[in-house]
Amino acid sequence: SGYDFYTRASNAVWISGAGNLTFGGPDTDDKGFAMYRDNQKLEDGVIATKVLETHPQFIDNGVISGRYPAYTVVQGERFTAKIGFLPLADGTCGTGNVKFQLNYREGGGSVTPLGEWTKTCDGTLRSVDVDLTPLKGKTVEFILAILANGPSTQDWAVWVKPQIALP
């Protein structure tokens, strides 16, 4: 049991409003990008490992999402992660402001939301924790998504250690 969204990020299907994206960047791609950002200092000033950056398309209210290979949820499992932003080069917060979303799809059906968190760059990371009990025994594709609130230029959104595990 268990599912590591960081390790499996290269197996996810990443898309933005501009179409399909290749995992791994480059971080200059105006269509948006998803890539590893290990051992980078985050907005809280701490250097983190297992950091997945998901930057939305560089337009107002841009989006990006990654649909992961199917997983069968085990009784008692939870989705956990810390969410936040990469800071500016000088370590201060930029204008990052997004909605982080955890969604899922069952059997190619419609996308169903599991959690949504609005976050601005404020010098802290936020811990998220979602009980997956309603999905126990179901085989679903989880989707990590970022929706920009307004301009997306500095939406260097990161998921730290995103995973499904038993507590």
Q: Which residues does each predicted region cover?
A:
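Gly-Asp-aromatic-enriched flexible segments
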Residues: S1-P167
